[in-house]
Amino acid sequence: MNRILIVHTSWYEKHIAKMLDISVGILEKSYKCDKAKAPGAIELSALAKNKLEKNNYVGVLFLGIIIRGETSHYDLVSTETFRSIGTLADQHHNIALINNVICVENHPQLKERLVINTQNNTNALIQL
């Protein structure tokens, strides 16, 4: 059975657990899912790169949440996270990589987007 790597952050555990349940529920019908937890969003691509070098995966799904705070930290984290995942995708063009790191202004936006974004992005991974 082909393997999918799901790399997720350690922040917002309750929400990440829901994202994992949704993704695994969709993927496990056709794939074996391996999970790896990164300390934060910026570390997602480094962890995935390490796992890709040691294992044979047909796809990687990134799960994370970045919520704007009162400082510019949000801008730095979201920009660097998306840049590093994009760079990894360029380096591994033969593997399907989907970024489901959800960037929001607040918790109501997260609640509004979490389920549908996770479902859509997990299904997009299958289509690649």
Identify the meaning behind each predicted range.
Residues N2-K35:
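Glycine-rich phosphate/diphosphate-binding loop of Rossmann-like nucleotide-binding domains
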Residues L5, V58-V60, I95-V101:
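Structural motif
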Residues S10-W11, I65-I66, V101-E105:
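Short, ordered loop/turn segments at secondary-structure junctions
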Residues I26-K54:
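Active-site rim loops that border cofactor/substrate pockets in soluble metabolic enzymes
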Residues L47-I85:
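Glycine-rich phosphate-binding loop
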Residues V77-C103, K111:
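Short, acidic/small-residue loops that bind anionic groups at enzyme active sites
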Residues P108-V115:
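Internal, active-site/partner-interface "lid" segment
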Residues V115-L128:
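A charged, well-structured terminal subsegment
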